UniProtKB/Swiss-Prot annotation:
InterPro entries: Cut8/Sts1_fam, Cut8/Sts1_sf
Job description of the protein: Involved in ubiquitin-mediated protein degradation. Regulatory factor in the ubiquitin/proteasome pathway that controls the turnover of proteasome substrates. Targets proteasomes to the nucleus and facilitates the degradation of nuclear proteins. Required for efficient chromosome segregation. Restores protein transport and ribosomal RNA stability.
Subcellular location: Cytoplasm; Nucleus
Protein family (similarity comment): Belongs to the cut8/STS1 family.
The name this protein goes by in its record: Tethering factor for nuclear proteasome STS1
Keyword Nucleus appears in the UniProt entry: yes
Residues forming coiled coils: none
A GO cellular component entry from the record: cytoplasm
One Pfam family matching this protein: Cut8
Gene it is expressed from: STS1
Origin species: Saccharomyces cerevisiae (strain ATCC 204508 / S288c) (Baker's yeast)
Chief location: cytoplasm
Top-level lineage group: Eukaryota
Gene3D superfamilies cross-referenced by the UniProt entry: Tethering factor for nuclear proteasome Cut8/Sts1
Length: 319
């Protein structure tokens, strides 16, 4: 009977030399030569498996494949168009201002594109109402604006919002009068609403804190006179339009003049000099209006000279 085979088949020579002829029964007894050959075979097998298991021993018994760099997907920023779609209005505006500051040569191109756009009057009014609301929201909670006696602390808190609103108002008015806008009715209506917004702003107890309001109303008075001059020169509008339209503007202007302590007296007198009756009356009223306009321009020029010679506030938007 044959014994165990330890992974290989022994040759006939080793079998003959390792089996005793008698006295041991039928059991094979391996000799020293068999043990040595088996040890050499085991060592060769271990040497073959050693490079294969090198990484396994190095990483604590866990074999890992090294990732190939070409097979990974790397993150990347958004394209310019997608990024701009996600930016809000303030971010886009700040980006444009920064670009024009760093590259002044593009300011003219941007300005040309902007003035070529046709912004509706309603859009301008919506913006003005937002900025007017910001003025009211900046009032300190412990002071009531209904009494028109806000203190110095309230003026310091509200000043940035007031200047922003008045600057925006002046810019929009200049963009909605001739020759930018040829429709005199639309210009007068827009100026009427803007005047009402300024008149209704909360005022301060100290007269010097109301300087920006008063200065703005003076400028609005000049704009009123300018539009009335355009109306007087266009006799077709004077004769064709219903007189109730002009009387409505005059009535509202009279209310504004009372609330502004007479700062709108000059355009009010020009309106009263208009006669919406017969053509002869209209022509005579035009002559009297022209005399008033000459006086108005002389007064406006004198005021501008006084402002330039005097010490005006450096942050005023109306100088």
């Amino acid at each position: 009977m044959m014994g165990f085979e330890w992974g290989f088949k022994p040759s006939s020579k080793i079998t003959q030399s390792t089996v005793s002829s008698q006295g041991t029964g039928n059991v094979m007894i391996p000799t020293a030569g068999v043990k040595q050959k088996r040890r050499y075979a085991n060592e060769e097998q271990e040497e073959e498996e050693l490079p294969r298991n090198k990484n396994v021993m190095k990483y604590g018994g866990v074999s890992k494949r090294r990732p190939q760099p070409g097979s990974l997907i790397r993150g990347q920023p958004l394209p310019l168009q997608r990024g701009m779609e996600l930016m809000n209005k303030n971010q886009l505006q700040q980006l444009l201002v920064d670009l024009m500051t760093k590259h002044p040569e593009i300011q003219q191109s941007v300005h040309t594109r902007v003035i070529g756009l046709d912004f509706s009057i309603q859009k301008c009014l919506d913006m003005l109402k937002q900025k007017s609301e910001a003025v009211y929201q900046s009032i300190p909670y412990n002071r009531s604006y209904e009494s028109n006696k806000l203190d110095d602390y309230a003026f310091v808190r509200m000043k940035p919002q007031i200047l922003e609103f008045l600057n925006c108002l002046v810019d929009f008015i200049l963009d909605n009068i001739p020759p930018r806008l040829e429709n005199l009715h639309a210009s007068l209506k827009f100026l009427d609403i803007c005047t009402e917004l300024v008149i209704k702003l909360p005022r301060f107890e100290l007269a010097s804190n109301n300087y920006y309001y008063d200065k703005c109303i003076e400028q609005l008075s000049h704009v009123w006179c300018t539009l009335i001059e355009h109306v007087a020169r266009d006799r077709i509008i004077l004769l064709a339009d219903n007189s109730s339209v002009w009387k409505s503007h005059m009535t509202r202007l009279q209310v504004y003049n009372e609330h502004s302590n007479g700062l709108l007296e000059r355009p009010l007198q020009l309106f009263k000099s208009l006669d919406m009756g017969s053509p002869s009356a209209a022509s005579s009223s035009t002559l009297s209006l022209q005399e008033s306009i000459i006086y108005h321009h002389d007064t406006m020029t004198a005021n501008e000279n006084n402002n330039n010679s005097g010490s005006a506030a450096t942050d005023s938007p109306f100088n």
